[in-house]
Amino acid sequence: MLVFVAGAQSSAPDLKTRIQKLIDSSGGEVAVALRSVDGRTELLIDADKSFHAASTMKVPVMIELFRQAEAGTLKLDDQLPVKNEFHSIVDGSVYQLDPGDDSDSVVYANAGKTMSLRDLCEQMITVSSNFAANLLIERLGVENIRHTVTRLGADGMQVLRGVEDNKAFDRGMNNTTTARGLMVLMEKIATGHAVNPSADAEMAAMLKRQHFNDAIPAGLPPGTVVGHKTGSITKIHNDAAIVYGPKPYVLVVLVRGIQDQKVSAALIASISREVWAAAAK
C-alpha cells in the first residue's frame, strides 16, 4: 500500500511509479516510509509490514540511554565494566560475542576495563558495535527500552533481546520493526521530541557520524548532511535516515530477500535518489 498526503501532490504518482518500479524489479520485499520534518508530506509503501530490525534496533537503545540520563537514573559519563558475557532470554544461559562477527574492535580492546556509557553509545551507533549494544541493553533494561518505544508511538517496533542470542534466534524470538515505526523514532529525534532538544541534538550528531554510507547517503548529492542508522544480516538490509536538505525529511527503507548486500545497498540508494529528486521540486 502507498499513501501520499499533503504537499507536492502532483509529484506523488510519479514518485510512486518510480519507486514501485525499482521494488518490482529488485526481487526482494521492500518497505518504505517517508515523512518531511515539517509533517506536511508522507509516503508509505508496505510501511506496516514487519521486518527483522537487525542493527536499526540500536536507535531505541540510544534513545532510552539519553532518556535515563535526563531522568537522573544515570549519567552519560558513568563507567560500565566491559565484560563479554551475556544471558539468553530463553533460559538465562551465558553466551559470548564473537569479535569476528562484529564491526567494532574498540570495545573488545577494552575488555576487562571500563568505558563510559556515552562512548559505548558512540560505538554502537557509528560503527554498529554489537558488543556495545549488548552492554547497554543489559544496563538499561529491555523492558525500559520497549516502554520508551511504545511511549513515542513507534508501533511495530519490538526490541526483545541483545545481539547473537542464538537460542532466541532459533526460536524466532527476534527484534522486529516496521518502516513506519522506525520513521517515527527518527522523526522524534529530528524534531527534538524523543527526549529533549539538547539530548536529541547529541543523538542526531552521533547519527551523522555513521561510518556505513553505501545505502541512503549514496543516493544523495555529495556533501548532503545525513544522520542515519543501518542494519543488516543475511538477506536483510535496512537504513533509517534524517536527510538535512533544503526540505529536511526522514526516510526509512527496509529490504528482505536479497542475498548480495551490494545489490540491496544499490536498491536503497536508488530509492533515496528518487526521493531526493521529488523533494527538490
Set out the residue ranges of the language-model regions.
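Conserved catalytic neighborhood of penicillin-recognizing serine enzymes
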Residues: 87-134
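Active-site SXXK
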Residues: 40, 52-80, 124, 251
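Short, conserved catalytic-motif segment at the N-terminal edge
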Residues: 21-51, 74
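Solvent-exposed, acidic/flexible segments
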Residues: 12-16, 50-59, 73, 110-118, ...
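Short, well-structured active-site flanking segments
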Residues: 67-91, 146, 196-199
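Bacterial Sec-dependent signal peptides at the C-terminal "C-region" and cleavage site
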Residues: 2-13
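Mid-domain, small-residue-enriched loop/turn segments at the edges of structured enzyme/sensor domains
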Residues: 29, 113-117, 121, 127-186, ...
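Structured C-terminal helix/loop/strand segments within mature extracytoplasmic catalytic/sensor domains
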Residues: 11-22, 42, 139-141, 184-214, ...
